[in-house]
Regions:
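Noncatalytic, basic helical substrate-engagement surface that gates or grips nucleic-acid strands
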Residues: 2-168, 174, 185-189, 193-194
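Extended two-metal-dependent nuclease catalytic cores across DNA- and RNA-processing enzymes
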Residues: 2-8, 72, 76, 100-102, ...
Length: 313
């Protein structure tokens, strides 16, 4: 996939006003993780007794699983780290939206359901359990910024965010996850704000999508893509290794990356050399998991993806 420095920084007009659509799951999660790295001291309201736990998650585990802890709720204690987490999120969000070019902003958070989980029960199964603070922070953000927050239903926050931003004439996407760069538009990476706002054109976005169709998203979402390299691919394209990772995917697409039709043909050929007669089913499966549409409730279709490609290819 392209790196941030490959994109166009001249399309963005700093003198105009934009609406920033923020895929905020990472922003929220990171604040919850930071808090959970430190000890958590709590004070019981009635007795005044204090107790220190290794982390906030350990405190919640005590309340939910220990026979003594089950007698209490969080409300029975003064828990300073909760306030710290709220303050940290507020400060982080302020740094993101405190830009002269931002007229308004919307925060997108992931809800409880996601169609990808129905298609693939192992979706995100490689992730560690979320820190307990995430739920408290999620509820707080939904209350504190209720006029700004939108929670996704049966999709990722990034699906909701992208579709809304793409249909906003002054929309710009605030993001971290590279999955969102598979569509064309204005982007602002809130972990690299010094880079500024950049534009991804349609060919670059399609190339990013094709890369993901090959290598999936193993480390983050447990989407394996093509997790092996067949003998036929090694012989035809001169690549090695045990599986198609991001570097191999980029190498396989390098000579066709400036032509959408040629990229389609290349992806199809690699799937055919990997899966034989079942190549379409496998491409449909991976595409359904990695594709993020600019249209609400539109999903990946291998037949639509292959439009324009000679059926004999």
């Amino acid at each position: 996939m392209y790196s941030i420095d490959d994109y166009n920084f001249s399309v963005f007009d700093p003198n105009k006003k934009y609406h920033l659509h923020i895929d905020a799951d990472t922003l929220l999660f990171s604040r919850a993780v930071v808090i959970d790295n430190d000890p958590c001291t709590v004070k019981h309201h009635k007795s005044g007794r204090k107790k220190t736990f290794d982390s906030f998650s350990d405190f919640i585990h005590f309340l939910e699983n220990d026979e003594k802890g089950k007698k209490f709720t969080v409300k029975d204690f003064d828990v300073p780290v909760i306030g710290f987490a709220f303050s940290n999120f507020n400060d982080s969000l302020k740094r993101v939206v405190d830009q002269n070019w931002i007229e308004d902003y919307t925060i997108y958070l992931g809800g409880a359901t996601n169609f990808r989980k129905d298609l693939y029960p192992q979706y995100k199964a490689n992730r560690k359990k979320s820190p307990a603070m995430r739920k408290f922070l999620f509820d707080y953000v939904c209350w504190k910024y209720k006029e700004k927050v939108k929670v996704s239903v049966n999709e990722e926050a990034e699906d909701f965010c992208l579709a809304q931003a793409m249909n906003d004439p002054i929309g710009c996407i605030g993001f971290v996850d590279k999955d969102l760069t598979t569509q064309s538009g204005l982007f602002f990476n809130y972990q690299k704000m010094d880079k500024g706002v950049f534009f991804i054109n349609k060919i670059q976005a399609f190339y990013n999508l094709c890369c993901q169709l090959l290598h999936g998203d193993r480390s983050t979402d447990n989407i394996v893509g093509i997790n092996f390299i067949s003998k036929e691919i090694k012989e035809k394209y001169g690549v090695g290794g045990k599986s198609i990772g991001e570097a191999t995917a980029m190498k396989l697409l390098d000579d066709v990356k400036h032509d959408k039709l040629l990229m389609k043909e290349r992806v199809a050929d690699i799937y055919k050399l990997s899966y034989g007669e079942s190549w379409k089913d496998n491409l449909q499966f991976t595409g359904s998991l990695v594709f993020i549409s600019k249209i609400k409730d539109e999903y990946f279709s291998v037949d639509k993806f292959m439009r324009g490609v000679d059926s004999g290819q």
